[in-house]
């Protein structure tokens, strides 16, 4: 059961990264460059296929997406609340 929870969170993190990236009209390559991570790795994280360390997530969220953990994890995706538009 715990394995499925881990899979679920990887997918949710990837979906949120993609959501923020597309909202900001950025490509995976642009985010990867700003975050100093490999574009292929970035693609795998975004698609829920790879785990990213906290350090790497920090680089992607803060540097690559110019966001922060509070905003990143406050999305409806993680807490079931709807975002106001």
PLM regions with names:
Residues 1-23:
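A short, Lys/Arg-rich alpha-helix, primarily the initiator
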Residues 1-6, 70-85:
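Short, charged recognition helix plus adjacent turn
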Residues 15-34, 59:
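Short basic helix-loop element that most often maps to the first helix and adjoining turn
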Residues 49, 64, 76-80:
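The DNA-recognition helices of helix-turn-helix-type DNA-binding domains
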Residues 55-71:
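DNA major-groove recognition helix of helix-turn-helix/homeodomain DNA-binding modules
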Residues 17, 31-32, 42-45, 72:
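Conserved hydrophobic/aromatic packing and binding residues within compact polymer-binding modules
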Residues 36-51:
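Recognition helix of helix-turn-helix/homeodomain-like DNA-binding domains
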């Amino acid at each position: 059961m715990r394995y499925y929870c881990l899979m679920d969170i990887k997918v949710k993190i990837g979906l949120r990264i993609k959501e923020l990236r597309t909202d900001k009209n950025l490509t995976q390559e642009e985010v990867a460059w700003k975050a100093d991570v490999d574009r292929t790795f970035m693609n795998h994280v975004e698609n829920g296929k790879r785990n990213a360390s906290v350090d790497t997530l920090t680089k992607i969220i803060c540097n690559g997406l110019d966001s922060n953990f509070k905003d990143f994890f406050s999305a409806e995706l993680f807490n079931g609340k709807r975002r106001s538009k």
